Regions:
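N-terminal small/polar loop signature for handling phosphorylated ligands or for N-terminal nucleophile
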Residues: 54-118, 198-258
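An N-terminal, well-structured beta->alpha segment
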Residues: 4-73, 77-79, 158-180
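Gly/Ser/Thr-enriched, mixed-charge loops and adjacent short helices
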Residues: 118-240
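Glycine-rich phosphate-binding loop
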Residues: 103-111, 115-117, 237-259, 264, ...
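Proline/glycine-rich low-complexity loops and linkers
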Residues: 137-169, 173, 261-334, 338-340
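Short glycine-rich phosphate-binding loop at a beta-alpha junction
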Residues: 53-59, 182-184, 286-292
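Phosphate-binding and adjacent anionic-ligand microenvironments
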Residues: 284-442, 448-470
Length: 470
């Protein structure tokens, strides 16, 4: 079966390119980018990735259907075929790309951003990310220079492809006996609704929140990193006396967790906790990836288990590639992305949640609580990321580095994503936002007093010299 789309698009020479970023294409729909951009990105993907077949999925946002139609028309006008999987989570597209051997794929989504946003995540062979440096920058250049988009003499066709059953079968292999585990699960009105009940069931001990697809996200923004968005889940955990709370973002590539007391758990600590599954249950003592913001406690917990830690840049375009390069077993980021060798070195909110629920169920059988297991990992006081609005980001970063390295000699230094500078009793990371005039600062110390002292120094320095505001 195939069908052809009929879509009228006004092709322009100039296009609003404000949506091209380091990891993907994303911005306010109709303001930062439009149908013209969507069409042209679709048109240039086959040439960029040398693909004659492109897998395409989309999330449930209100604008996703029209973007989908524009992207598909661009791909087929360029002469490539489209395999349309319809509504999908982003990891479903990764699965489809790698499992069925596609050389290119597009997921239409703005992930965790508010409803007025939309975007595209592009992947190539084996679900490898195509970020700005790996090809999206070339697409932008072609659009900027007005490269022609003539319709191919032989237009591509559009085929419907069903992958959900295969995806669920793949994921069910990782589910162990969850026993009488009580779980509260916030689906954020997003794409986790496609699979959560199929995987975790609908028994009375699984309590779902916002379990309908609604691209307006009427209950909260689909971003679990914003504290208030987790309040309903935290309340539900306490109400039903759940053993764990789970919350997905809009496209279900990220997931975060709440303990049985309704307290948010920092995602980097869950990288460490996963050692109970990968090392404790499966005996996999290989390399583990963490981002440059991760607590020192993660490595201090996993290294004695026989794991080798690898620290790297923030963002899927970097993390998934690095995990593949080092043949790592698993990894994660402070933003709630978790990457797995078992999942084509890509991130999956579903697989991460399955693994954590397996761990919590095992803890419960041992008479232990999730909060107790996390307490065995935490060793430091941590600021979390603090955003400073500043125009001269590089100058401000250099000033912070110079200020502290003049006081004492670092015990470790990294400069591949901003700066991470470590001292005997504290460390900090300062890095620029890729999309906004912000510096992101995070520090960790052995005591609360030391932590507050260093934050105060940064506040003062950035305010006085750069006019920075939080």
């Amino acid at each position: 079966m195939f069908f052809l789309l009929s879509l009228q698009i006004d092709i322009k020479t100039e296009s609003n390119m404000g949506a091209f970023h380091a990891y993907d294409i994303r911005g306010v729909w109709g303001k930062d980018w439009d149908l013209d951009t969507a069409y042209k990105v679709g048109y240039f993907i086959p040439a960029l990735l040398k693909a004659d077949k492109v897998l395409v999925g989309r999330d449930c946002r209100v604008s996703s259907d029209e973007i989908h139609d524009a992207v598909v028309k661009g791909i087929t006008d360029a002469g490539a075929d489209v395999y349309d999987i319809g509504l999908s989570s982003t990891p479903m597209v990764y699965f489809g790309t790698a499992n069925y051997g596609f050389d290119a794929s597009v997921q239409i989504t703005a992930s965790h951003n508010p409803a007025e946003y939309n975007g595209m995540k592009v992947s190539t062979t084996d679900a490898q990310a195509v970020g700005y440096d790996a090809g999206l920058g070339q697409v932008k250049a072609w659009i900027d220079e007005g490269r022609p988009t003539p319709v191919s003499a032989v237009r591509g066709q559009v085929y419907r492809k069903e992958i959900l059953a295969d995806y669920l079968a793949f994921m069910r292999k990782f589910v162990k006996d969850l026993g009488d585990l009580t779980v509260a699960m916030d689906l954020s009105n997003g794409m986790a609704n496609l699979f959560a009940k199929e995987i975790f069931g609908t028994d009375d001990n699984i309590h779902y929140l916002f379990d309908t697809l609604d691209g307006r996200f009427p209950n909260h923004e689909p971003n679990p990193l914003i504290e208030k968005n987790c309040y309903p889940l935290e309340e539900k955990v306490r109400e039903v006396k759940a053993d764990v709370g789970v919350i997905y973002d809009g496209d279900a590539d990220r997931v975060m967790f709440v303990d049985e007391q309704g307290r948010f758990i920092s995602p980097d600590l869950m990288i460490a906790l996963m050692g109970r599954y990968f090392v404790g249950e499966r005996g996999l003592k290989g390399k583990v990836l963490q981002d440059i913001r991760s607590s020192k406690a993660v490595g201090e917990y996993l290294t004695p288990m026989g794991c080798e830690m690898q620290t790297w840049k923030v963002g899927r375009a970097f993390a998934a590639k690095k995990l593949r390069e080092i043949d790592g077993v698993w990894g994660g980021e402070l933003a709630g992305h978790y990457y797995f060798r078992d999942f084509f070195y890509s991130d999956s909110g579903l697989l991460a949640s399955i693994i954590i629920l397996n761990i919590v169920a095992a803890l419960k059988r041992e008479g232990k609580k999730l909060s107790e297991a996390v307490a065995g990992i935490v060793r430091y006081e941590n600021s979390g990321e603090i955003n400073y609005r500043v125009e001269d980001k590089q100058g401000a970063m250099d000033a912070v580095k110079a200020h502290f390295t003049a006081q004492e000699t670092p015990s470790a230094f990294m400069d591949f994503d901003g700066y991470r500078v470590e001292f005997p009793d504290w460390w900090f990371n300062i890095r620029p936002s890729n999309t906004e005039p912000y510096l992101r600062f995070l520090c960790e110390a052995t005591t609360r007093e030391r932590l507050q002292e260093k934050i105060a120094e940064v506040d003062s320095l950035l305010s006085e010299r750069f006019g920075a505001k939080r």
